Design a protein with these regions (language model features):
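Active-site oxyanion-binding pockets that recognize sulfate/phosphate
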Residues: 4, 59, 63, 139, ...
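Mg2+/Mn2+-dependent nuclease catalytic core
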Residues: 100-180
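Short, hydrophobic/amphipathic alpha-helical patches that form generic packing surfaces
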Residues: 1, 12-23, 155
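A non-catalytic, helix-rich entry segment at domain boundaries
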Residues: 17-104
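Short His/Asp/Glu-rich catalytic/ion-coordination signatures at enzyme active sites or charged loops
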Residues: 2, 54-58, 180
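Alpha-helix N-cap/helix-initiation sites
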Residues: 7-11, 34, 163-166
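Generic recognition of stable, solvent-exposed alpha-helical segments in well-folded globular domains
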Residues: 9-13, 68, 72, 118, ...
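C-terminal, charged and often intrinsically disordered regions of DNA end-processing helicases
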Residues: 1-7
Length: 180
């Protein structure tokens, strides 16, 4: 059926915009124009409103409105942009920007205890001999649910980058209700 939902689209749009912000950082560290940023976000949301939503397909809502996605998404993005992590990225980690891996288009394969793993990191940052892997989350905190995902990221990075586990730090970055 190819259905999406409001929470899924908040996550998808947040990921897409953070990817754009990080790719912009590769070219410029100039401050982000808030008005243009919000207009860009609204255009992305308008495009996503053309998808088939669970909430309308099953008659929970008649129509999905832009504000139903915008409010939480802009909160997530503003939390990211005002976080100490983003400050660290643009002030310190930027030094190794040529080695950043931002939302690769394909899944990477790895092995863990003889099993194949397929992973797709949101953002990988080599910095001062370590690897930091950030995974953006816009939903509820659930450390148990995501711990296996973090192990997969660490295994992938170890396998492909020839790094020891102690030099790899996978991080769940919660964007809502505040950046954690």
């Amino acid at each position: 059926k190819g259905l999406t939902s409001i929470p899924m689209e908040v996550g998808n749009v947040s990921h897409d915009v953070i990817q754009s912000v990080l790719e912009r950082l590769l070219k410029s560290t100039a401050p982000i124009d808030t008005e243009k940023f919000e207009a860009h976000l609204k255009n992305i949301i308008r495009s996503s409103l053309e998808k088939n939503f669970f909430e309308t397909y099953y008659d929970e809502l008649e129509k999905i409105e832009l504000d139903q996605l915008f409010e939480k998404t802009i909160a997530c993005l503003n939390n990211f942009l005002s976080s100490k992590r983003f400050e660290w990225i643009k002030d310190k980690a930027i030094a190794e920007k040529d080695n950043w891996l931002i939302e690769p288009s394909k899944y990477g394969e790895s092995r863990l205890e003889g099993l194949k793993l397929y992973c797709k990191v949101d953002f990988l940052i080599p910095f001062e001999g370590k690897i930091f892997i950030l995974d953006w989350k816009t939903g509820k905190k659930d450390g148990g649910k995501y711990s296996k995902q973090l192990v997969g990221y660490a295994a992938w990075a170890s396998y492909h980058l020839d790094m020891v586990a102690s030099d790899i730090e996978p991080i769940i970055a919660y964007l809502h209700p505040e950046y954690e």
